[in-house]
């Protein structure tokens, strides 16, 4: 695995620190316009007291040591003790050849030999996906791509909540729509789901069963015929799971394993996990309720698993599910992408799994906060379909897959998000999605022009590439691997978007001021075409992580 220029500089500084018994970590920054050097470090400032030397005096020692590496064209010392370095052109030229030889693998980290299981979306199969699910889907799928790029084995999982009262309510909701579609006066209970999507399913049921169930009664959460209730539950689950899978596929989200809550009950996983807790002396009774000793692993209080009426609390099937998942997947880490309203649930889940003998840190929760749509400066409620939510299918019709994915990935998932619909439909540089895709369109345009003129890009010597923006951009491209590592470690999708914007900002400025195809200087033109190919490749690699497409022309 090749070493980046920043890694090279860091390693050189670290070696000098070890020679001088300096324990401080070198800090490196990229200089704008390469003045007075490509990279700078404050290591001499922050460590001078440790070795009883003045910063400028220490900087001179570092300079002489760096010169011995034969990697630097120039080393400048700036008051009060900064080191500014310019690497040799042949080192810089390796960036382009590395990018174009590795292609889609550029930026890949070494194999970690660790497996991450990531569960995301996991919307109840009770209707269409809404914009909140969309944010969860984007954060989850981008993290999947990041972890793969960072060298992990990655398993993707969707947990289907197909047991519990919400499915009973779904069955009644669909049943009422079925009756209404038969022109039978059927009053919808207040707790039923809203939306015209249930009309579509009702028509499918009528086509198969006609008036067969017209005389059956119902309550708020039950059809008063067990077999019919079970039938409507299963038909509804199957229908909406199919819809959800298609909506995710249309949104460029692929999830391989779909696990079932009902299966946890059917295979007696809850009884099994209770026996495990009992064998580990992790349970006790109080006021006829069964408690789990979660305070042993940092929870603020012990948690009830079985209430005094013998019904289960929410956490018990969740613990059984996760214990089963740990055994089935053999993953080193489970990551769940959950809505922000689950925050108080995290510690008790981690403690519950630790009481089963698992690593307390095996379960990690990534929180995803709410999304609010903004149009004309105020909150926007889409009204195309009945219901209280903003449906994913509707917003995709308005803004498209790429725009929505990019914007949802561009902000920290821990923060509430205002999604400006006016901004992401603009066709100018103020729209970050347009700005990013326009860069790929410009790259393709340049390469197409060169192809028409029969000018072939060169990848070898790039010593002639000495424009400050070329050098700055080469360094940014070279840093892609570091961005991947930091983004994966921090679970930070927005860092990839920030990186894309940084490339595009420098590139658009470069494009505006430089004549890239100059038939009077073919050697430089060919080198610049190789440079453009490298820029395009890194953008495409970053786009792939976000799950959006490069654009050929705009």
From Swiss-Prot:
PROSITE patterns: AA_TRNA_LIGASE_I (PS00178). The keyword Aminoacyl-tRNA synthetase applies. One of its GO terms (cellular component) is cytoplasm. It is an enzyme of class 6 (ligase). Coiled coil: none annotated. One of its GO terms (molecular function) is arginine-tRNA ligase activity. One of its GO terms (biological process) is arginyl-tRNA aminoacylation. It comes from the Bacteria. Its EC number is 6.1.1.19. Pfam families: Arg_tRNA_synt_N, DALR_1, tRNA-synt_1d. It catalyses: tRNA(Arg) + L-arginine + ATP = L-arginyl-tRNA(Arg) + AMP + diphosphate. InterPro entries: aa-tRNA-synth_I_CS, Arg-tRNA-ligase, Arg-tRNA-synth_N, Arg-tRNA-synth_N_sf, ArgRS_core, DALR_anticod-bd, Rossmann-like_a/b/a_fold, tRNAsynth_Ia_anticodon-bd. The keyword Endoplasmic reticulum does not apply. Keywords: Aminoacyl-tRNA synthetase, ATP-binding, Cytoplasm, Ligase, Nucleotide-binding, Protein biosynthesis. It is found in: Cytoplasm. A motif ('HIGH' region) lies at residues 123-133. Belongs to the class-I aminoacyl-tRNA synthetase family. Monomer. This is Arginine--tRNA ligase. It comes from Mycoplasma mycoides subsp. mycoides SC (strain CCUG 32753 / NCTC 10114 / PG1). The gene is argS.
